[in-house]
Amino acid sequence: MRSASTLAVCAATLLQIACSTPIHPFHARSHQSYPSTEQWPLPVVGKQLEHQVPDEDLQEILSQISRDNIESTIRKLASFGTRHTLSSQTDPVRGIGAARTWLTAKFQEAADESEGRMTVDWNSFIKYPGDNERIIFPVNITTVVATLKGSEDPDRYYLTGGHYDSRNSNPIDYQGDAPGAVDDASGVAVSLELARIFAHYKPKATIVFTAFAGEEQGLLGAQNLAQTYKNASVNLAAMINLDMVGNSKAEDGTTDPHNIRLFCQGTPLTENASTTTSRLSIGGDNDSPARNLGRFIYEVASNAWTEMTAGYTGVRFVQPNEDYTQQHQNVTVRNGKQYGDLTQWLDFEYNTRAAKVVASTMWSLANAPAAPTNVGVNTTMSDNFSQFKWDAPKGLSVQGYEILYRETIEPHWTNVIDLGNVTWYNLTSATIHKDNVIFGVRSVGKGGYKSPAVLPFPFGCARNC
């Protein structure tokens, strides 16, 4: 599991400013009238945003997600004893090599049902000792990659997956048991189950289902795959990482079976100083591509409950609570308490619900047009107009665009303005304008599928430029 200390939870904090007594800094002007608080919240422009309802194909996909299949995959992966990155790659029944062979065969079974749309490959490299204390001898690191080609926009990729390597208390113990049931057979099981189901469908954009290796040594497999895509100029629009999605119970026994955490990077790690300055100038530090992807997921997938250094947008799903007596622990009993990442800790119903959230996300992303590009808002006009412009995305045809907005205290988009198929818009509201709310612009495609929103960056020119 990747430490959450390097990531930010995809949510905003509500700040409430309160004083025990009124503050009147200008006593000489005490007769001056001030705006009534009844004017807040702001009047609505457009309409209230509603969560996306699954279409018939997505409903069918969700109905096919099998708890039994997910459980079977997790138990099988745990049965290899250890899947440590440094463990045997030749033993037919124990170690990461045996797990890789089995996973490859299972992904290939899915591909065989796809009528040629899905292919299965390995993304492999040799990692040498030197700059990583958890690599003590040269080792082959292989990610299993199942690629389902898009039917209309195959050059736009969306990727999801978990890591199939595991570890125990000692990060370089590659011989001792490390069943890795929750961390992260639970994530790999989701990736494999969705590959099995999606192979029978034709998403418009390409979807990649993966099982990464080398995660416990520092996200090595995921980083190499992302760099491979970058070197090949692949348009990887989003990466959805599944790292521990199988247990809702905390160490103190608290359960939270109907929530899942979503970690989203703030200001992109690869963003240059000039872009960051522009972002901060308009208060956009909470509207990075990853966080707007998180808002998209909240909109399209929340109903299912009832990779950064390469410059790609990525988020990570993880269960609501963690129990550190199970995670990265030797399989042992101490003082009558069982330790270790064992299958007995799994909540398979929870794992299945998590799979439905991911399925909703991937299907909705792959069937929507790409997000608009070069999205801007004119910040030079000192008036109540908010002038926007953007460019149409490549790939799938766009039926129209929407402006989303939310008050600055809101974590999620609350309202939407339907614009039609235009590439600029003047919002003339005296209250809903660039000084009062956060805006985003998104594409709308056939069937009402929508892209994640894009934060408009500042530009300056005469009106209607």
From Swiss-Prot:
Transmembrane segments: none annotated. Glycans are attached at residues 140, 231, 272, 330, 378, 384, 421, 426. It holds the Pfam family Peptidase_M28. One of its GO terms (molecular function) is metalloexopeptidase activity. Binds 2 Zn(2+) ions per subunit. Coiled coil: none annotated. GO terms for cellular component: extracellular region. The keyword Mitochondrion does not apply. Residues 371-464 form the Fibronectin type-III domain. Zn(2+) 2 binds at residues 183, 216. The keyword Cytoplasm does not apply. It is found in: Secreted. It is an enzyme of class 3 (hydrolase). Its EC number is 3.4.-.-. Residues 1-20 form the signal peptide. Its main location: secreted. Belongs to the peptidase M28 family. M28B subfamily. This is Probable zinc metalloprotease PTT_17836. It comes from Pyrenophora teres f. teres (strain 0-1) (Barley net blotch fungus).
